[in-house]
UniProtKB/Swiss-Prot annotation:
GO terms for cellular component: ribonucleoprotein complex; ribosome. The gene is rpsK. Part of the 30S ribosomal subunit. Interacts with proteins S7 and S18. Binds to IF-3. HAMAP family: Ribosomal_uS11 (MF_01310). PROSITE patterns: RIBOSOMAL_S11 (PS00054). One of its GO terms (biological process) is translation. InterPro entries: Ribosomal_uS11, Ribosomal_uS11_bac-type, Ribosomal_uS11_CS, Ribosomal_uS11_sf. It holds the Pfam family Ribosomal_S11. This is Small ribosomal subunit protein uS11. It comes from Rickettsia bellii (strain OSU 85-389). One of its GO terms (molecular function) is structural constituent of ribosome. Located on the platform of the 30S subunit, it bridges several disparate RNA helices of the 16S rRNA. Forms part of the Shine-Dalgarno cleft in the 70S ribosome. Belongs to the universal ribosomal protein uS11 family.
């Protein structure tokens, strides 16, 4: 019963990465990727225990950024480029949370999609 010992898988060290922040009206999704777009770590407000309307709060976005950044730092990530999109109110607090993580930020890009008279917007809610 000879067992072969496998070598431990070496963790990649990535120094330059991109942070994709999607701030919708209902949730915040954060993904850290390398320059080619391969995901390093990701987190969302729902996955961090926030339910319902609490997922769309700035505090939930801050916690989400902290969790995803913690995982990304294990890969040696130091320099990031930020791509933020979506209409949510969490955008500003997500940015502040990223600046508090001691990353070197090279660029900030707003990638929110803007309709140029495409599909008809959903009707207004009457409360």
């Amino acid at each position: 019963m000879n067992q072969t010992v496998k070598a431990k898988k070496k963790k990649k060290t990535i120094t330059l990465g991109v942070v994709h922040i999607r701030a919708s009206f209902n949730n915040t999704i954060v993904t850290f990727t390398d320059v080619q777009g391969n995901a390093i770590s990701s987190a969302s407000a729902g996955a961090n225990g926030f339910k319902g309307a609490k997922k769309a709060t700035p505090y939930a976005a801050q916690i989400t950024i902290d969790k995803a950044a913690e995982k990304a730092k294990e890969y040696g990530l130091k320099t990031i480029s930020i791509r933020i999109g979506g209409p949510g109110a969490q955008r500003e607090s997500a940015m502040r949370a990223l600046f508090g993580q001691n990353f070197v930020v090279t660029s900030i890009l707003d990638v929110s999609s803007i309709a140029h008279n495409g599909v008809k917007a959903p009707k207004r809610r009457r409360v």
